[in-house]
């Protein structure tokens, strides 16, 4: 009983996909305004992704090295991490440390 339901569901999904694709192809061949806008936006997306890919190939190591820079400074080579909030630094109190 369950097999017929699964087959029916799968058949409906395939029919829906085929009808969507046939309608899409008909619109594509009609070359109306919606298709022109879709082509422009899709080509912009593809060109942007290709540009990002090539930029990452060229500058990826530099960006990675800048992020994981080793040095005497803070976590990423910047200022040291002090973890002082505005209240502690304004009061001028020294940071309390745990002593055993």
Curated annotation (Swiss-Prot):
Membrane topology annotation: Single-pass membrane protein
Biological processes, Gene Ontology terms: osteoclast fusion
Keyword line: Membrane, Transmembrane, Transmembrane helix
InterPro entries the record matches: TCTA
Compartment annotation: Membrane
Record-stated family: Belongs to the TCTA family.
Name this polypeptide is given: T-cell leukemia translocation-altered gene protein homolog
Species name: Danio rerio
